[in-house]
Structures are given as C-alpha cells and as structure tokens.
A protein has these predicted regions:
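Short, charge-rich amphipathic interface segments used for partner binding and complex assembly
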Residues: 35-71
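Short, charged, intrinsically disordered terminal tails
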Residues: 3-8, 66-74
C-alpha cells in the first residue's frame, strides 16, 4: 500500500495556507481512522480494543482540528 505524506517545515505560512493545511489534515486523519477501524476487525480481541481506543483518540484530535478551522473561519 503506497501512501505519500507531504511534510512541512517550520517556515512561516500565511493564514490561508495554514487553514488549507488544517482542512487537509482533518480529512486525512478521518481517512486513516476509517482504515484503522477496518484493520481492527482483523486483530485479536485485545489488539482490536487498543486500535479502537486509538481511533477514538484520533477522532477526538480531528474534531479539535475541525474546531480550530471553524474558529479561523468564523
């Protein structure tokens, strides 16, 4: 499975660029959460539980990013 990440440096970015990056990251994280959830179904009970807990935390983080987007747009 090929997966590409575009890593960003600590260079200053405009507010518009930051907002675009946040939107991308929220969507990207949501996609990974879906993949992880599906993967959990193939694991042992304890491992699946740990992955589902991780997905929950990832979803919480993604929601914080979405809130930041709303604040920035608002």
């Amino acid at each position: 499975m090929e997966h590409k990440h575009h890593h960003h440096t600590n260079e200053s970015v405009s507010a518009e660029e930051a907002l675009a990056l946040l939107k991308y990251m929220a969507q990207h994280n949501a996609h990974h959460a879906e993949e992880l959830q599906a993967t959990a179904d193939s694991l042992s009970d304890n491992a699946a539980l740990l992955i589902r807990e991780a997905v929950s935390l990832l979803n919480q983080s993604t929601e914080k990013i979405r809130q930041a987007i709303q604040e920035s747009e608002g």
